[in-house]
């Protein structure tokens, strides 16, 4: 998509009313991981080079200045800690309550990292966990809710296991032989976890039970890739509180809850570019604070936000309530031979309408959007 100067100027003028806050940053190398370290900092890591930088970035102080923004000069992200991985970083997660990161790349290992305190600016690798399966490259990772730090991880269904970080001891394995690739995985509560494969199937497991429940799609197109997002409250035991969204590379979307994973309570089709099925940055995410809002990216240089409140069992093609086009309007995108594609986006854990997004051109944005209906 070629962006003209006039179109870019028009977007800039529109953005003055479309955002409460909009801060743009340029990374030296693009990232496809954005991991929250709390309310005011994130971790990012490169994926394009043999040696990849891992950074902890403080969000712009101006974002938190409220009515005193005019008195705050800090508009940029600030590097707080940094380190280097000897391989591209495919997945990165933070262990809650610690200064520990876990990453995976193109080797069949997990790397454990320590983020220094106030007396050090270094992110240092402290141990490597060797995975037995030769196919365990680029493992998806999610933190466990156990007393000692653990991670659930795997690149294909049969490889998924729960591992204790301090010892490398395997605490649980998924009792299913399947070579299907993992699209994502996440804990619902302290014991129950959900896995989505790239063919759209869901698996529900429990660390207290060696078996898993398998929920394949009724109709599956082998040419499609699927991504998923889970919205849950670990303090809630009611299955209806956990919403699952699945999105295919053709734009087909399924919404389910844990009471009946076989039958989605809603399915719809969103508009996506025809060439979008070739990329692997597809991302769907529920808003943690706003009820029934979810976001989609990875098809082009845009992040779209949808309100699912009025979606029915067979909804017609819904329109986003907001679209962030900043990455395709950036100077880097205009000067590039290929259009920028959003590689990752993430909602702020406590600010209802604040998101971060990153793109293939190295751009990193934090933005607080305005809902033209509710914010009038």
Swiss-Prot record:
The protein's name in its UniProt record: Integrator complex assembly factor WDR73
InterPro entries, alphabetized: WD40/YVTN_repeat-like_dom_sf, WD40_repeat_dom_sf, WD40_rpt, Wdr73
GO MF: protein-macromolecule adaptor activity
Localization, UniProt: Cytoplasm; Cytoplasm, Cytoskeleton, Spindle; Cytoplasm, Cytoskeleton, Spindle pole; Cleavage furrow
PANTHER family on file: WD REPEAT-CONTAINING PROTEIN 73
Region (Disordered): 316-336
WD repeats (start-end): 84-123, 276-316, 337-376
Free-text disruption phenotype from the record: Brain growth and morphogenesis defects.
PROSITE patterns to which the protein is assigned, alphabetical: WD_REPEATS_2 (PS50082)
Keywords in alphabetical order: Cytoplasm, Cytoskeleton, Repeat, WD repeat
Cited function: Component of a multiprotein complex required for the assembly of the RNA endonuclease module of the integrator complex. Associates with ints9 and ints11 in the cytoplasm, stabilizing the ints9-ints11 heterodimer and blocking the active site of ints11. Brat1 then joins the complex and plugs the active site of ints11, leading to wdr73 release and nuclear import of ints9 and ints11.
RNA-binding keyword on record: no
Origin organism lineage: Eukaryota, Metazoa, Chordata, Craniata, Vertebrata
Family, per entry: Belongs to the WD repeat WDR73 family.
A biological process from GO: cerebellar Purkinje cell differentiation
Main location: cytoplasm
One term under GO cellular component: cleavage furrow
Gene3D superfamilies: YVTN repeat-like/Quinoprotein amine dehydrogenase (2.130.10.10)
Name of the encoding gene: wdr73
Organism: Danio rerio (Zebrafish)
